């Protein structure tokens, strides 16, 4: 969303969007403070906008983008008038972004070094206000960064607020897991923890040398594995994430063996295709595998994990790159505003079910696309039955 306000002088704001019909004067009606729940609101009409607290009038530069704002959106406006949407009022899923800073510097991270240095997230009290502005009926919350645990006090305060205010919500924490190698920190989280928490942690290789070469953080393999073990020992659900690149593709079967041996109780293992921006774009030649090659690399590891009763999913894999027997584990994992399709995708019968490509990946790599015919969607695929036979029998025991 490319939205900013012309000649903006109203200062940084965090606001709840309310769309209203414009009165005859062309100015939006005044919003009383009690209607705003004590928080700032941005009142939008067809041709006018203002903040509720001081009636500061605003002039949007791109009116088409302005119309993308929905009632119930939560936004920030910076000193220059640039608008960023934190929450979409059309959704019942929320993202809580604590910081861009990270104690790893993964070679394939889609965030650039500059973004990590400069993106600090909301101030503490603004974050608390944001959590209170979210609708109570939110059913999924993702807590993310950077490395969200680096803002230790805010992280713990955030998790406790979520635990109290959103008791029924599924909560996904994206972290490198290293902070949970510290028992004291883990106990602080457990003191008041969201009831439906899953912690998603990347594991890049079955041994320290390669894992640490990918994270570019010496000692991270040991800390991450200690964190995973500590979380599982406390009964916290753990999702392992494996980002597939040239660096680790040849070692994925060994990584599957490692997971089976050490973490058989893991909630799910997700194999993830690259997003070619940030560090990944900078090191593209050393990292990039096209989606068909990435699938060929993950297939033996997927089967091994399934044979041992471990759930597996594929993120960021277009369906045409994946054998039909594995379509059922592919997820539409790319956020809607980042999804793009190649011209050839228009001929594909599977497009409504396919997650497509990242915009940057499509632009930088020009991936080959093989449209799937309609008949392929309804075939009785014997390979599917063979590939998953042992996985099914293992679950039935």
Describe each region flagged by the PLM.
Residues 153-160, 181-191, 250-258:
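Distinct, well-ordered alpha-helical segments
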Residues 87-124:
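Canonical Radical SAM [4Fe-4S] cluster-binding loop centered on the CxxxCxxC motif
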Residues 160-163, 250-267, 322-339:
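Short, electropositive alpha-helical surface patch
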Residues 110-123, 136-151, 163-182, 193-225, ...:
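Core AdoMet radical
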Residues 4-12, 323-397:
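Flexible mid-to-C-terminal extensions adjoining Fe-S/redox cofactors in radical SAM and related proteins
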Residues 196-198, 222-283, 293-316:
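Conserved C-terminal portion of the radical SAM core fold
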Residues 1-40:
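Short Lys/Arg-enriched alpha/beta "domain-start" segment
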Residues 36, 46-95, 113, 325-332:
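N-terminal [4Fe-4S]-dependent radical SAM core
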């Amino acid at each position: 969303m490319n939205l900013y306000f012309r000649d903006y002088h109203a200062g940084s704001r965090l606001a709840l969007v309310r769309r209203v019909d414009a009165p005859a004067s062309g100015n939006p009606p005044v919003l009383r403070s009690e209607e705003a729940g004590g928080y700032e609101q941005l009142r939008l009409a067809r041709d006018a906008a203002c903040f509720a607290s001081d009636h500061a009038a605003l002039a949007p530069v791109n009116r088409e983008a302005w119309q993308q704002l929905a009632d119930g959106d939560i936004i920030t406006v910076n000193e220059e008038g640039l608008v960023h949407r934190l929450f979409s009022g059309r959704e019942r899923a929320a993202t809580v972004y604590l910081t861009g800073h990270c104690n790893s510097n993964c070679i394939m991270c889609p965030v650039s070094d500059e973004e990590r240095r400069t993106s600090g997230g909301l101030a503490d009290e603004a974050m608390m206000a944001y959590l209170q502005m979210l609708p109570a009926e939110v059913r999924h919350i993702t807590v993310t960064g950077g490395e969200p645990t680096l803002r230790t006090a805010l992280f713990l305060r955030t998790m406790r607020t979520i635990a109290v205010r959103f008791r029924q919500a599924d909560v996904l924490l994206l972290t490198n897991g290293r902070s949970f190698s510290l028992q004291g920190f883990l106990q602080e989280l457990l003191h008041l923890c969201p009831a439906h928490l899953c912690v998603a942690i990347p594991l890049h290789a079955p041994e320290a040398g390669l894992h640490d070469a990918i994270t570019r953080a010496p000692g991270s393999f040991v800390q991450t594995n200690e964190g995973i073990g500590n979380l599982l020992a406390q009964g916290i659900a753990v999702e392992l994430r494996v980002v597939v690149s040239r660096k680790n593709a040849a070692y994925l079967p060994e990584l599957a063996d490692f997971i089976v041996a050490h973490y058989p109780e893991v909630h799910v293992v997700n194999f993830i295709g690259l997003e070619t921006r940030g560090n990944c774009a900078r090191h593209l030649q050393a990292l990039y595998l096209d989606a068909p090659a990435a699938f060929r690399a993950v297939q033996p590891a997927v089967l091994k994990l399934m044979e041992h009763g471990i759930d597996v999913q594929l993120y960021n894999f277009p369906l045409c790159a994946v054998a039909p027997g594995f379509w059922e584990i592919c997820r539409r994992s790319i956020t809607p505003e980042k999804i793009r399709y190649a011209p050839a995708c228009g001929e594909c019968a599977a497009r409504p079910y396919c997650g497509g490509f990242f915009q940057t990946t499509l632009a930088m790599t020009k991936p080959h696309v093989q449209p799937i015919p309609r008949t392929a969607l309804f075939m009785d695929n014997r390979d599917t039955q063979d590939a998953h036979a042992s996985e099914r029998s293992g679950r039935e025991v």
